Amino acid sequence: MKGMRGRLFVMTGASGVGKGTVRAKVLERTRLFYSISMTTRPPRPGEVDGVDYYFVDRPTFEALVREDGFLEYAEYVGHLYGTPRAPVERALSRGEDVLLEIEVQGALQVKRAVPEAVLIFLLPPSLSELKRRLVYRGKDSPEKIQKRLEQAEWEIRNAHLFDYVVVNDVLEEAVADFLAILTAERRRSGRMGEALEMALRRDLALEAELDEILRRRYGGTGH
């Protein structure tokens, strides 16, 4: 809306819960500026710089850290990951709603930096189902899967720190729940200043015509 900042939505959840799949479906169905993360890890096969991540070397990343250029950042498995601040701020200033898809610790950092951010935690149906997804994803060793599950259990136990939770059991239901949250937040009365202002506007020329119709129909002034 004109003159209003956009809203910042943050999707997070355990590794393997399906954040990327839900995010892709959500972006197909509603207008959001998706903020691309930056990382020092090398691209995986099929990944494109500026689409999946901004791939940079460690000195470049660390220089941006010193310049306070990240909303959040963290080191994970030897590589740095972060959300560049400038693209997010530009989009919010234009009145665009922004979506981040980041890890749990990063999401909590964002909430501290931007208290009005809306945090949405994606839950697995169960830890056993999460383990099944991690196994069939085929990317991690048994040791790494166990570590991810331990981390996931800690994250789930802290889900109360987030504004909403969505269970990703049936994909389409999870997407519908996520979209419902976006709709509810967009309709909050505190965020609808321009819409409320427009609803109170009077078109004097139109009302004069209507008053004339009433006068002819009923006589008098039409009031």
Swiss-Prot record:
The SS bond pairs are none
Q: Which GO terms describe its molecular function?
A: ATP binding; guanylate kinase activity
Q: SUPFAM superfamilies under this entry?
A: P-loop containing nucleoside triphosphate hydrolases
Enzyme class, top EC level, equals transferase
Pfam families according to UniProt = Guanylate_kin
The UniProt record lists the Guanylate kinase-like domain at: 6-183
Q: What is its main location?
A: cytoplasm
Residues that hold ATP according to the record: 13-20
Q: Where in the cell is it found?
A: Cytoplasm
Q: What is its EC number?
A: 2.7.4.8
What are its GO cellular component terms? cytosol
Question: Which terms are listed as keywords in the entry?
Answer: ATP-binding, Cytoplasm, Kinase, Nucleotide-binding, Transferase
Recorded hits in CDD domains, A to Z, give: GMPK (cd00071)
Record Gene3D superfamilies: Guanylate Kinase phosphate binding domain (3.30.63.10), P-loop containing nucleotide triphosphate hydrolases (3.40.50.300)
* Enzymatic reactions: GMP + ATP = GDP + ADP
Which residues span the membrane? none
The record's similarity note reads:
Belongs to the guanylate kinase family.
Q: What does this protein do?
A: Essential for recycling GMP and indirectly, cGMP.
Q: Name the chain's protein.
A: Guanylate kinase
